[in-house]
């Protein structure tokens, strides 16, 4: 399945759990996560969505580690099975 279709599936799954999901299209930082899932009184979830064979770039890995170093623990890489 195309990565964009898989991403829509992930968005629907998180919205069904009560999250407000924001898709980040263009940001001031390259390599930023694809999605942010928000729910009141909970830590945000930063999500990088990847297809079965699409590798995570070094910059995307750096951004994930950067978020973790800032104290965010919900930094996810979700890969299509």
What are these regions (language model features)?
Residues 1-81:
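Catalytic phosphate/metal-binding cores of nucleic-acid and nucleotide-processing enzymes, i.e., regions
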């Amino acid at each position: 399945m195309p990565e964009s279709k898989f991403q829509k599936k992930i968005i629907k799954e998180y919205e069904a759990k009560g999250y407000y999901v924001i898709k980040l299209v263009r940001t001031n930082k390259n390599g930023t996560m694809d999605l942010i899932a928000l729910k009141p009184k909970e830590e945000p979830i930063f999500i990088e969505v990847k297809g079965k064979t699409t590798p995570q770039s070094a910059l995307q890995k750096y951004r994930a580690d950067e978020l973790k170093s800032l104290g965010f623990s919900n930094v996810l890489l979700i890969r299509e099975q």
